[in-house]
């Protein structure tokens, strides 16, 4: 996608403790009526939607959770309707965005005016100066954390991916808190994201990977 093709507004899908990064693909099971409407509208237009975490510490006047400022726009690359009227889609992350304002409308789902100017680098294919050897300690600590929480990860398959896919996949799949995942999403670069993962893992290791908060 080119800069000139980026939309000025987008439908947003608030999902707690879930993030998507550029250049990663995730499956989604859509069943709520308002989000079925959202997918229908998206499929009729540009197939784009924004994934964003609700900010559960802040609420609007109607008691609806506010949204975090930063999310990631994705494009629907696969769509299937099930016999019980659910939608099974795959969403490919394209570029992060910042919310400027929420748009008031009669639609059941939420829409926002958005800005991409701080994240144009997400559209580029530049390679960052990171080696797999830089991830060895992170892999070791993550394996301990995942095992402790009962998570099953195909590590061999993960190691065959590119570095950005590996780091972003680990960030998405990790049993981190909402706030911790938001920090990873907002990290300016892949190198910074890798460092943030290491910092979070350090706080967990102090409590034998049972910690649930990070300062």
Residue ranges: model-predicted function:
Residues 1-152, 179, 183, 190-193, ...:
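Positively charged
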Residues 152-158:
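Acidic interhelical loop/turn segments
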Residues 158-176:
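Core structural elements
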């Amino acid at each position: 996608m080119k800069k000139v093709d980026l939309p000025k507004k987008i439908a947003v899908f608030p999902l707690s403790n879930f993030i998507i990064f550029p250049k990663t693909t995730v499956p989604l099971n859509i069943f709520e009526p308002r989000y079925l409407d959202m997918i229908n509208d998206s499929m009729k237009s540009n197939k784009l939607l924004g994934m964003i975490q609700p900010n559960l510490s802040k609420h609007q006047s109607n008691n609806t959770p506010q949204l975090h400022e930063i999310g990631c726009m994705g494009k629907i690359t696969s769509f299937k309707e099930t016999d019980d009227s659910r939608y099974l889609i795959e969403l490919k992350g394209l570029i992060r965005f910042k919310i400027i304002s929420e748009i008031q409308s009669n639609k059941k789902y939420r829409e926002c005016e958005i800005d991409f100017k701080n994240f144009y680098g997400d559209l580029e294919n530049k390679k960052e100066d990171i080696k797999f050897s830089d991830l060895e300690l992170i892999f070791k600590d993550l394996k301990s954390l995942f095992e402790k929480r009962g998570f099953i990860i195909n590590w061999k398959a993960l190691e065959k991916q590119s570095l950005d896919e590996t780091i972003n996949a680990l960030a998405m799949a990790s049993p981190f808190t909402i706030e911790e995942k938001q920090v990873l999403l907002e990290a300016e670069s892949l190198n910074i994201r890798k460092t943030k993962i290491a910092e979070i893992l350090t706080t967990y290791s102090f409590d034998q990977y049972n910690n649930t908060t990070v300062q």
